[in-house]
Regions:
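Regulatory and interdomain segments flanking nucleotide-handling catalytic cores
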Residues: 1-289
Length: 289
């Protein structure tokens, strides 16, 4: 039986609204992210991310769950700008695979056709995310949950959105290491947080104390979650993260806790965890049958 792969195509939302300078800045931001992700997820990628056309990037994953968690991470790294995502799960033309093309632009097959259709419908129906495969029933289940996630995110104020981004980058849905060490990962996250969080002033963000705090938090998360490789660490954010964010943003812990509850941070994370587990159980089990 032919193996299924996962094609993922992302593009920048509303890119035509930006002037040339802003658009160049945003494209540079996305370029730095995919360069990082290609190292961060190098064991999960069949073909690395690359620009395919205009503001679009695409890649090919072995597993659909890895593609989904990678999308969630890229979305948070790219914040406050938005991306659309089409994921396609299916076969790849084996003749193209046998040629061992380096570029994903040279590949073809139903996984790519599904991903292209999913991205097209995202634009048409104004969704952020859609997943398509040969099983419409399970696709519908995933897409409905992710639609709920989008609606919950839309309810966030600017400050809530900034704090939620901080939560997600310090405590991603899943961990990866690739060929990178924790310090490299932490440094990249620190640089992105300085770009992303706009509602608060990070006077001491580049101080040794703040960097040590973030490095310590990322290290702790990675070490603890490494013990449960490819398993969910928790369906809630850690309670410790409230204090970490309060120190970084120079606000009270109670303020962070209130934002967390009102913004339904844990509810959103639980829904994303549900999607991740469902994808593993309902899509990837086919390979074992």
């Amino acid at each position: 039986m032919k193996k299924n792969y996962t094609a993922i195509i992302l593009d920048i939302q509303h890119s035509r609204k930006f002037d040339d300078d802003k658009r160049l800045y945003i494209q540079d931001k996305l370029f730095s992210i995919i360069k990082f992700i290609n190292d961060y997820c190098n064991k999960e990628l069949v073909k690395k991310f690359e620009f395919s056309a205009g503001d679009s990037i695409q890649a090919l994953f072995y597993n659909i769950s890895d593609a989904f968690s990678c999308y969630c991470f890229i979305k948070n790294l790219f914040y406050p700008y938005q991306i659309r995502c089409g994921i396609g799960y299916g076969k790849i033309n084996q003749k193209f695979m046998d040629q061992n093309y380096v570029s994903t632009n040279m590949l073809d097959g139903e996984a790519y056709h599904y991903a292209i259709s999913a991205l097209h419908d995202c634009k048409l129906e104004k969704y952020d995310f859609l997943i398509y495969s040969s099983n419409e029933e399970r696709d519908y289940f995933v897409n409905q949950i992710m639609s709920t996630v989008e609606l919950l995110n839309l309810d966030h104020t600017y400050k809530q959105a900034d704090i939620f981004n901080l939560f997600n980058l310090l405590y991603p849905l899943e961990i990866r290491r690739g060929g990178m060490n924790i310090k490299e990962i932490s440094t990249f996250i620190i640089n992105k947080l300085k770009e992303n969080v706009l509602s608060y002033k990070f006077e001491d963000f580049t101080s040794s104390g703040s960097i040590k705090l973030i490095l310590g938090e990322v290290t702790y998360n990675y070490q603890e979650r490494k013990k449960q490789l490819h398993k969910l660490f928790d369906q809630r954010f850690s309670t410790k993260i409230n204090s970490v964010c309060a120190v970084l943003l120079n606000v009270s812990r109670q303020n962070i806790e209130k934002m967390r509850v009102v913004g339904k941070f844990d509810e959103i994370r639980k829904l994303e965890c549900l999607v991740l587990e469902y994808i593993r159980n309902e899509y990837e089990h086919e390979k074992k049958d």
